[in-house]
């Protein structure tokens, strides 16, 4: 407690001394700020001391106090900034500005407004100092006239301060537990806790505002002392090549800042990259001087070392000049040799240069990566570190010159990317078309392969005017018998699902026969006694296709009706010219216009017609039913009277099982019905024959 009171009295005395004169004592102000930053005095006590000094009625004292406060704000550390940005201090300034009894001096008021504006501009984006900005905006709203704004960086308020102390039960270096005999000691540089053996060194810490020697641990002591001796201990070419330049260009912080945030290796790499960028990537032999090989002198002779450094500088400069001259001569000789010996290669070698002019060199790429690494390191360092490292600024300028080249390289890369995307889309389209073609070929191959195992419908090369008939009938009866004798066929028969137009000749045939159907004699079948030669069967071959030519009226009847009883495996139907007796003239006279009717024999595949006919067997067929088959196959009319016209009901019969019928009619086939009374297409409804009923009854009576 005694130490606190003594420190408070010390800060009060120093503040009073610094603000007693009308002239600003910069040295004393910096000493006070270092005392606050080193935490030699409590920041709240320092703030209250400055606040009491501002309440003095003397304007000169008020102005000096304001200047001292500004110096302490910029160098006192974050812990003091928090006290200045508190309501206690800022509200006191506002109350001084709004004093009504004794008006504030104009100079003091202007200085106070200027400082509030500067602090608010520098504290932007910091939540712990947000009240300064609120006060500034409130004064603006109340109509206070502030001076013109000046751009102030936030790093103005940044200053290094001793870290907060860290507590632990063991030494953070040797891990020895603390006890009554082994006491704790905090390092003033890093804030960690160590025992007496690991923190026996003492050093002043001017970068933290601590000017007297304080306790530090062995690690911080080695780090701080090695950084002070690092330029003389480096042995690489960067150290002895640019030793004097580095010493003069590096901006060391006040008092020799030790915690720069960069390691020696990183500094060395930064210097080497800058040198390589300046030399444009050229390399050459660097002869080492003899002075480097000499052992270092004792540090007790500074004058001799300075003389040796001067000699070393002269030797290095001479070697550098020789190296540059050697490189220039070598480059000129290489250029002349390449131009004289290989003239033909100049054009091909010069061609890629414009193409690769936008590409980054390895040195430039390395500089970009190094700059990115340095910027990442700066994220974990105090904001003022970037101002103390001129190498970062130089590297930023060198990288900024690469923006056009980098933009062009990026544009070229994007154009290549777009081209590759277009090519990929085209390849995808080609692959899709190729897959579709393979699928079509595969499906066609499967279709051709399945033709040998299942009846696949196909276009017939010949026109067909006959209706579909079943290939086989149960019990040895063919589809032809069922056509003539089954009266259930007309009810169960289904028309083709897809109608197709009939060829023109069939339509003409239909018109011709249809016009004659009304004049046909009812006694066409009135001569059942005419003998018919049974020598030639109607089904001659399994796969033969015949197209009989039009013949006379005597060839209008089929050969042998008994041939229908045999098993008819093939599905073709055609007529053969029958052998008619010479005395068959009544039949010829009954059909006078028959030679005009054309015959078209074509194979018909019979499928898809389930039926159960009740027709009798083929041997029971009367002889007068044979001539009806000579005109072609015809669907049974749905009228029962019309069905009696073609065939009477048999006395006995066995019902046939349903027989499937496949292969629908295709466009290549011409399906039609040819009957003694007319020809009807497959897709048109059946027209009943036009002969009157009485002739039919007379013919049945005659039978």
UniProtKB/Swiss-Prot annotation:
Record keyword Metal-binding present: yes
Parts forming coiled coils: none
PROSITE patterns cross-referenced by the UniProt entry: UIM, VHS, ZF_FYVE
Membrane topology of the entry: Peripheral membrane protein
Gene Ontology process terms (BP): protein targeting to vacuole; protein transport to vacuole involved in ubiquitin-dependent protein catabolic process via the multivesicular body sorting pathway
Compartment(s) where it occurs, according to its Swiss-Prot or TrEMBL record: Endosome membrane
Keywords, in A-Z order: Endosome, Membrane, Metal-binding, Repeat, Zinc, Zinc-finger
Record GO terms (molecular function): phosphatidylinositol-3-phosphate binding; ubiquitin binding; zinc ion binding
Domain VHS as annotated: residue spans: 16-147
GO cellular component term of the entry, any: endosome membrane
Amino acid composition bias (Low complexity), ranges on this chain: 291-303
Start-end of FYVE-type zinc fingers: 165-225
Domain (UIM) ranges: 261-280, 307-326
Biased composition range(s): Polar residues: 279-290, 335-350
Biological function: Component of the ESCRT-0 complex which is the sorting receptor for ubiquitinated cargo proteins at the multivesicular body (MVB) and recruits ESCRT-I to the MVB outer membrane.
Subunit structure: Component of the ESCRT-0 complex composed of HSE1 and VPS27.
Domain remarks: The FYVE domain is involved in the binding to phosphatidylinositol 3-phosphate (PtdIns(3)P) which is required for the association to endosomal membranes.
Name by which UniProt lists this protein: Vacuolar protein sorting-associated protein 27
Organism: Aspergillus niger (strain ATCC MYA-4892 / CBS 513.88 / FGSC A1513)
